[in-house]
């Protein structure tokens, strides 16, 4: 996970964040967060009839939340325990992804064209 990489390389990551490589670091964190969330949301979606576009949107929403949290954590000198925070957020948000996927089953087809990277 991205947090493990950051924890294992705190000094390097902090230097990157405070340098010209900040944008690259943010892109990397965003990319890793996306892979994690896409896999997780797809796994939860297996037993639903959620629309493909909604699966993508839900994963993207949580990718943004996760990556922003990690970037903010780096920006504030990584003083809090990311595992404890992640665990707590997980407990607070438990079931929301499945609930959103179930809602997708009953929504009209989404016809707007867009691409998320």
Residue ranges: model-predicted function:
Residues 1, 14-15:
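Two-component histidine phosphotransfer core
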Residues 4-5, 22-46, 56-60, 64-68, ...:
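Amphipathic alpha-helical packing segments from all-alpha helical-bundle domains
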Residues 42, 55, 64, 68, ...:
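C-terminal peripheral helix-coil segments that are non-catalytic and often amphipathic
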Residues 13-14, 40:
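Short, structured loop/turn "capping" segments at alpha-beta junctions
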Residues 18:
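Phosphate-coordinating loops and pocket residues in cytosolic domains that bind phosphorylated ligands
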């Amino acid at each position: 996970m991205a947090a493990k990489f950051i924890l294992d390389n705190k000094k390097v990551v902090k230097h990157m964040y405070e340098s010209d490589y900040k944008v690259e670091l943010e892109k990397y964190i965003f990319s890793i967060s996306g892979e994690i969330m896409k896999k997780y949301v797809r796994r939860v979606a297996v037993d639903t009839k959620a629309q493909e576009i909604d699966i993508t949107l839900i994963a993207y929403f949580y990718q943004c939340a996760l990556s922003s949290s990690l970037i903010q954590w780096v920006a504030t000198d990584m003083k809090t325990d990311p595992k404890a925070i992640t665990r707590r957020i997980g407990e607070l948000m438990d079931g929301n992804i499945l609930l959103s996927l179930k809602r997708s089953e009953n929504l009209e087809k989404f016809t707007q064209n867009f691409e998320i990277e």
